[in-house]
UniProtKB/Swiss-Prot annotation:
SUPFAM superfamilies: L domain-like, PDZ domain-like. It comes from Drosophila melanogaster (Fruit fly). The keyword Repeat applies. The gene is Lap1. Residues 716-752 are annotated as: Disordered. CDD domains: PDZ_canonical (cd00136). LRR repeats lie at residues 18-39, 41-62, 64-85, 87-108, 110-131, 133-155, 156-177, 179-200, 202-224, 225-246, 248-269, 271-292, 294-315, 317-338, 340-362, 363-384, 386-407. Keywords: Leucine-rich repeat, Repeat. Gene3D superfamilies: 2.30.42.10, Ribonuclease Inhibitor (3.80.10.10). This is Protein lap1. May have a role in assembling adherens junctions. Residues 770-849 form the PDZ domain. Belongs to the LAP (LRR and PDZ) protein family.
Length: 849
């Protein structure tokens, strides 16, 4: 044949190119490659991260395909033609949008590896259990709630990963998985380790981390071939003693649980190399830990250990020891026998000294003793020739610092400029409070240039300095009351203002902070007055308004926390002087002001007329502190400054600035439903007003119309909220009706000041909130009424749950009127008769505490 092709070139055949592997990974594809041209020879096809939307049917002509990777794409389904790939052994479909698996996949009899992780399966089809050749099955983050009952048919399975699902139990048929070597059920909803796990005797790796497991059954001791056990982030408080049968375990990690002690049998884990048990409640370690001859890494941080056992010196292979954030007071001298120790970290403890023979740890490279009570270092530290980092302070700039002899004559101790360590250590709550106070102080100073000249406390000697009068000896006023003197123009020109800015805001808050400061500067009052003189008077000499007393105490407590004021609250009184540009005269009556502490929060000043001056109080012997009369400014001239608005914390702002589209759609649907509900209620209420208007008297009808207008205005205002809160809406309505009632009362008192005081009609409600509600009922009214002992009127005695009455009424609400019928002087029988005669929609006016 070769001779014939040479003599006759027309008989020369072109040799077919053999291609058995194609790799298009990480290449965006607009069109699917024509891989079917190699359908006879193609065995491996890699299409990872290629933005595929679907698999074409021509792909399945390659019936010799053994490996198919289509992970990290946008596939929404698996074609039914997948069953034609009968030689397929490795199928990777993770990180797609697949919601179901076709039944035809059971035709892939030779499939050994199947990865469906990070898809929205929610349910595993029974066809998967027909793949009896399957050895590796990865179903991580697929929203599974259960496994098929016949899952045990996969007898050849070696690796099973079910991490990050919603599983609560495992099928009992898994006992047949005699070849299973790795089981990962972390991140599920298990509350107890399934009994079937203890029967998987070939298991080598068991991951049960981040569940809610409280107990591990004793049959777990049957896992004699176990090498890796991970149980972090559970609720374990004890471990079974049967774990001593794990003679081959090398890694044991049980961090972030509730363990207080280990069983003595933990020392029987002869092959243990890594032992992690941080973030528990351990108070001590068992002495049997000395039998862990192969242990190289021991992590004990974030526990409650008071001491380390002396037998720890028997750990000859120990290389890493972490015991930070405990309550250790000393380290045992036997620790210096761990010749292989290279990293020792015991920060945030109560150590006062290090072992004298610490120099025997010749392989030591890193030593961390930050935040302890160490005064000096032993002289044997000079023998640590391999030491590369020695951390003595959080503010240490270099890993190593030069050491000197503490006493040149004895030469037994070493020191440096960071020793002795500071003995004062704040707990987490104190540190958080101090950080908050520093932030508020710095932020207040930063905002001061933008604020307008509002009220400030200025003492007598400061006023003298400001007016360039003759200097007088400054009396010893309390330092926490005095405000810094206002600098003169000469002082302003000759000084440079230095200010430390806080940490920059996140990117989302910078523009918000800018607008807040501009709004403050624009809305601050330009005509505000200044306090020229102030005196300090104790609480016992001042009568505070009951409506403002609680808020004043809170503000004063906050001021005390920031500036270190004594616990006893003081009230400050000042003399307000009328600005010269005021066009209206100042009243001549004398007024004493209510307590003024935080002038930015309490910008509305209230005054009560004083009939007699307060007595003079003598403090500190010789010095007199007198309460001076205040002059009230006309209300129309007082600008109401906007309270200082600090930027919200980052974790709150992030919620409002980084919402996902799903969240925004959800909020929009909630808002639309709430608007529709409010419009329906408004329509029902308006119809009820129109139908019942003929039964009301003239006076009551006018009042109802006025109150209904207020209620409709209120409903129109709240309809624009994104996420209305029913409790907040009721509170605002109560405040609106209460304010309307108070205004009406004030008007009547002004016009009829000479009339005799009328009888209080609200019964037990000493500070009532009168409101009108529209109650619609179907099967029953939803509430009962009764008369209270020694009280006049009709009150709500009981409410039926899950009714409109339960949402609108409260117990002990006093009923003033029902559908125009006055109940203030009615008896119980008349009131019940009114309830029986009313329709399915009733208008109720009531008073509430």
């Amino acid at each position: 044949m070769p001779l014939l092709s040479k003599c006759f070139p027309c008989f020369k055949f072109k040799r077919e190119e053999v291609i058995d592997k194609l790799d298009y990974s990480n290449t965006p594809l607009t069109d699917f490659p024509e891989v079917w041209q190699h359908e006879r020879t193609l065995e491996e096809l890699y299409l990872s991260t290629t933005r595929l939307q679907a698999l074409p049917p021509q792909l399945f002509y390659c019936q010799g395909l053994r490996v198919l990777h289509v992970n990290s794409n946008n596939l929404e389904s698996i074609p039914q033609a997948i069953g034609s790939l009968r030689q397929l052994q490795h199928l990777d479909l993770n990180r797609n949008l697949i919601v179901n698996v076709p039944e035809e996949i059971k035709s892939c009899k030779h499939l050994t590896h199947l990865d469906l992780s990070c898809n929205s399966l929610q349910r595993l089809p029974d066809a998967i259990t027909s793949l009896i050749s399957l050895q590796e099955l990865l179903l991580n983050e697929t929203y599974l709630e259960f496994l098929p009952a016949n899952f045990g048919r996969l007898v050849n399975l070696r690796i099973l990963e079910l991490r990050l699902n919603n599983l609560m139990t495992l099928p009992k048929s898994m006992v047949r998985l005699i070849n299973l070597q790795r089981l990962d059920i972390g991140g599920n909803e298990f509350t107890e380790l399934p009994e079937v796990v203890g029967e998987l005797k070939s298991l080598r790796e068991l991951w049960i981390d981040f569940n809610q497991i409280r107990r591990v059954s004793a049959n777990i001791g049957k896992l004699r071939d176990l090498q890796h056990f991970e149980a972090n982030g559970n609720l374990l408080d004890t471990l079974p003693s049967e774990l001593s049968n794990w003679r081959n375990v090398e890694v044991l990690s049980i961090c972030s649980n509730s363990l207080e002690a280990f069983p003595f049998s933990v020392g029987m884990l002869k092959s243990l190399v890594t032992f992690k048990c941080e973030s528990n409640g351990l108070t001590e370690l068992p002495d049997s830990i000395s039998y862990l001859e192969q242990l190289e890494e021991l992590v004990l941080s974030h526990n409650k250990l008071i001491r380390l056992p002396s037998t720890i010196g028997m750990l000859r292979s120990l290389r890493f020891l972490f015991a930070d954030d405990n309550q250790l007071r000393q380290l045992p001298d036997e620790l210096c026998s761990c010749q292989q120790l290279s990293v020792l970290s015991v920060a945030n403890n109560q150590l006062s000294a290090l072992p004298q023979n610490i120099g025997n740890l010749s392989k030591m490279k890193v030593l961390n003793v930050v935040n302890n009570y160490i005064n000096a270092l032993p002289v044997s530290m000079l023998n640590l020739v391999n030491l590369t980092s020695m951390w003595l302070s959080d503010n240490q700039s270099q890993p190593l610092v030069p050491l000197q002899y503490l006493d040149a004559s004895t030469k037994t101790q070493l020191t440096c400029f960071m020793l002795p360590q500071v003995t004062f250590k704040m707990n987490s709550i104190q540190a958080q409070q101090q950080a908050q106070e520093q932030y508020e102080f710095v932020y207040a100073n930063q905002q001061q240039p933008h604020a307008s000249p509002s009220r400030r406390i200025c003492f007598a000697e400061e006023a003298t300095i400001l007016s360039n009068a003759k200097a007088q000896p400054a009396p010893n006023y309390p330092s926490f009351v005095a405000a810094p003197p206002t600098p003169t123009p000469d002082q302003m020109a000759g000084s440079v203002r230095l200010m430390r800015s806080p940490t920059p805001y996140p990117k989302e808050l910078r523009q918000m902070s800018k607008y807040v400061r501009q709004a403050q500067a624009a809305t601050s009052s330009a005509n505000a007055s200044e306090v020229r003189e102030a005196r300090v008077v104790t609480n016992g000499q001042i009568h505070c308004d009951s409506n403002n007393a609680n808020q004043d105490v809170v503000d004063q407590a906050t001021t005390s926390a920031i500036y270190g004021i004594a616990p006893e609250t003081t009230h400050i009184y000042g003399v307000y002087q009328q600005p010269q540009q005021m066009a209206h005269p100042v009243p001549t009556q004398e007024y004493y002001g209510l307590p003024l502490v935080n002038y930015e929060a309490h910008y509305q000043q209230l005054y009560v007329e004083a009939n007699t001056p307060l007595p003079t109080t003598h403090l500190n012997g010789d010095q007199d502190y007198e309460l001076q009369p205040l002059q009230q400014q006309p209300m129309q001239q007082q600008a109401l400054p906007t309270p200082r608005l600090e930027p919200p914390p980052y974790h709150i702002a992030r919620v409002y600035t980084k919402k996902t589209p799903e969240d925004l759609n959800l909020y929009e649907s909630m808002r639309q439903r709430k608007q529709q509900q409010q419009l329906q209620e408004q329509t029902i209420y308006q119809d009820a007003l129109n139908s019942n208007s003929n039964f009301k008297t003239t006076a009551i009808g006018a009042q109802d119309v006025e109150e209904s207008v207020d209620q409709l205005d209120y409903q129109n205002n709240i309809s624009n909220n994104l996420e209305p809160n029913p409790e907040e809406e009721d509170q605002e309505l109560d405040d609106t009706m209460s304010q309307h009632s108070l205004n009406s009362t004030a008007t009547n008192n002004t016009s009829k000041a000479s009339h005799k005081k009328s009888t209080w009609i609200f019964g037990v409600h000493k500070n009532p909130t009168v409101k009108q509600v529209t109650l619609k009922w179907e099967n029953s009214i939803g509430f009962d009424i009764a008369e209270l002992l020694n009280q006049v009127g009709i009150f709500v005695s009981s409410i039926t749950p899950n009714t409109n009455a339960a949402r609108l009424l409260n117990l002990n609400d006093k009923l003033l009127e029902i559908d125009g019928y006055d109940l203030t002087n009615a008896n119980l029988s008349d009131a019940k008769r009114v309830l029986l005669n009313c329709g399915t929609v009733m208008n109720i006016m009531l008073s509430r505490k």
